[in-house]
């Protein structure tokens, strides 16, 4: 096991290149199951979730080659092998295998998702969609069993706006007979990205990115080449790090419109940000930052995935800021870790209340989930002294070459193997 050390206080300066979107990649890769010939996806992030998906596609008979961010999948010899246990449990987005395998094979057995523990992440909307298309769905011993004689298009209204359910229903519906309409669909950029891939494969999809998506089922889908969109959450994390510690940081390979909610909040605090077609410039180091209230919402609102890094930055603001997470109420495990570093904050219901300004101090902290890890990295950059972060398996699930990118901007950051004594202490904590 390893820990991440950060010697805080270094100014960040320069350009950072953003990787492909994790939240797109975990849906694009299962979508390749639906094709009848080779699919190439370019620009994938080199993170553990992608390697897990590669292994799962191989497990069901796919021929998969992945290097330098490019994955080539030949799905022709895939079979509808049950995946109730093993690697599938490591992956929160393993549920996309349900929609893709149901779409192609009319059956699937998928172990219930793993990944970050952020309170209940029910998949009832996914199941509602599959049932509407004609599937029989049962939950047996922690795995979802899906079976269908045939899939027929349906009108599906999502009770909750859900990115996962919207994509999963799209995956299952593209090869169904007739027309499917998804109402109250999520509008995230990642949904448009998946729809773009499916359309390149021959699917007929209209309305991706709006709240009504229309799909006309087709008989088969063919291979294609697709380039993934940039990761708006990684870009947002570096914007926050640049705001916290930057002189001038340029975020390269980004779609600025995907980050308007964060850009607006940083400007409200007093930061100077410039945008171009595929870059953002953020000027850090401002004094007398204003406190702001942040409320997470579905896209185009403030992303829940940036709520945690934002709480670290708000320790710099003079006054009281309130961060409310309307998406995942349990996403405040990072608050106790920030308090170990000297932050003045508390949790009330779905909100974190942050009072500043406070000079954070280096400490030993633990990442409980992916974005909590990002928050602690930002806090470590800001802190006086050395911060030791454990729980790196969470960070490695979602950030590609994080230390290398931060080092390139001037941070002092390194990994170390943990001693047996440290591992024992961690396991007992």
From Swiss-Prot:
Pathway: Cell wall biogenesis; peptidoglycan biosynthesis. It is found in: Cytoplasm. Pfam families: EPSP_synthase (PF00275). The active site is at 116 (proton donor). One of its GO terms (cellular component) is cytoplasm. One of its GO terms (molecular function) is UDP-N-acetylglucosamine 1-carboxyvinyltransferase activity. The modification 2-(S-cysteinyl)pyruvic acid O-phosphothioketal is found at residue 116. Gene3D superfamilies: Enolpyruvate transferase domain (3.65.10.10). This is UDP-N-acetylglucosamine 1-carboxyvinyltransferase 2. It comes from Bacillus subtilis (strain 168). The lineage of its organism: Bacteria, Bacillati, Bacillota, Bacilli, Bacillales.
């Amino acid at each position: 096991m390893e820990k991440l050390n950060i010697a805080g206080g270094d100014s960040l300066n320069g350009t950072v290149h953003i990787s492909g979107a994790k939240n797109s990649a975990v849906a694009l890769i299962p979508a390749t199951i639906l094709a009848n010939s080779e699919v190439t996806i370019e620009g994938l992030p080199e993170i553990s979730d992608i390697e897990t998906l590669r292994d799962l596609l191989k497990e069901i008979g796919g021929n998969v080659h992945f290097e330098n961010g490019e994955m080539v999948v030949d799905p022709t010899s895939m079979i509808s092998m049950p995946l109730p246990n093993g690697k599938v449990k490591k992956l929160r987005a393993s549920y996309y295998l349900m929609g893709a395998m149901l779409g192609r094979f009319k059956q699937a057995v998928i172990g219930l998702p793993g990944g970050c523990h952020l309170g209940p992440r029910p998949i009832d909307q996914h199941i509602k969609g599959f049932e509407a298309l004609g599937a029989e769905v049962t939950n047996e011993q922690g795995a979802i069993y899906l079976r269908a004689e045939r899939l027929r298009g349906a009108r599906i209204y999502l009770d909750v706006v859900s990115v996962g359910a919207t994509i999963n229903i799209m995956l299952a519906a593209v090869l169904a007979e007739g027309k499917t309409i998804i109402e109250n669909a999520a509008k995230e950029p990642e949904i448009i990205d998946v729809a773009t891939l499916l359309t390149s494969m021959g699917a007929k999809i209209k309305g991706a990115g709006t709240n009504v998506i229309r799909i006309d089922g087709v008989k088969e889908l063919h291979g294609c080449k697709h380039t993934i969109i940039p990761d708006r959450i990684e870009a947002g994390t570096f914007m926050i790090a640049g705001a916290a510690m930057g002189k001038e940081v340029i975020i390269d390979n980004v779609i600025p419109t995907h980050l308007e909610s964060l850009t607006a909040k940083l400007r409200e605090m007093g930061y100077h940000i410039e945008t171009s077609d595929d870059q953002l410039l953020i000027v850090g180091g401002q004094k007398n930052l204003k406190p702001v209230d942040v409320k997470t919402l579905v896209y185009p609102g403030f992303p829940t995935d940036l709520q945690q890094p934002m709480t670290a930055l708000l320790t710099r603001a003079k006054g009281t800021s309130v961060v409310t997470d309307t998406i995942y109420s349990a996403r405040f495990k990072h608050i106790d870790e920030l308090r170990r570093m000297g932050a003045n904050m508390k949790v009330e219901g779905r909100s974190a209340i942050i009072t500043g300004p406070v000079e954070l101090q280096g400490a030993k902290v633990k990442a409980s989930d992916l974005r909590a890890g990002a928050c602690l990295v930002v806090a470590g950059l800001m802190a006086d002294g050395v911060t030791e972060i454990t729980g790196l398996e969470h960070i490695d699930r979602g950030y590609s070459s994080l230390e290398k990118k931060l080092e390139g901007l001037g941070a002092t950051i390194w990994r170390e193997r943990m001693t047996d004594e440290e591992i024992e202490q961690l396991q007992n904590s």
